[in-house]
Amino acid sequence: MAFYYKNNLGYQNIPYGYQLNDFRASFEKARTFDMEDDLEFCPSLSDEELVSIYQSTGLSPTSSSPSLSPMTPNLYPNVLPNVHPGVSNYTHHPLSGLHQNVGSRTRKSSGIPIIDPVTRAPAVLAGAVSSSRAKQMW
């Protein structure tokens, strides 16, 4: 008795480049579909509901168009404010005398500054602990 196996590979038969381009196109469409687009294409909302939503969110009905939805480069400002994370003194006390000069080095924090998208100013996090202080606590 012979058994025949049907090879169902699904997406594996489609070239990788096509899969990637298809994914990128659908991702870009989904990512740029904003609340404005939801309001424009939602037929179940009455005119009064639309007006109240526009007033509460500060959106204008004339700007809600899918052609005006922002693409990736327009989401972020071209020039970020000049933000310098604090310079912390990195002190290291080695157990052996082999690495004596390591303790005298000064190292900048490698953290990425968080920018408030509305004001485009550096966000200040309350209760944030620097990485050097966190290491000392452990």
Curated annotation (Swiss-Prot):
Question: Its principal location?
Answer: cytoplasm
Phosphoserine occurs at which residues? Answer: 110
Tell me the compartments it is located in: Cytoplasm; Nucleus
Q: Which InterPro entries match?
A: DUF4452
Q: Which UniProt keywords apply?
A: Cytoplasm, Nucleus, Phosphoprotein
One Pfam match: DUF4452
Q: GO cellular component annotations, sorted alphabetically?
A: cytosol; nucleus
Q: Write down what this protein is called.
A: Uncharacterized protein C22H10.02
What species is given as this protein's source?
Schizosaccharomyces pombe (strain 972 / ATCC 24843)
Its taxonomic placement starts with: Eukaryota, Fungi, Dikarya, Ascomycota, Taphrinomycotina
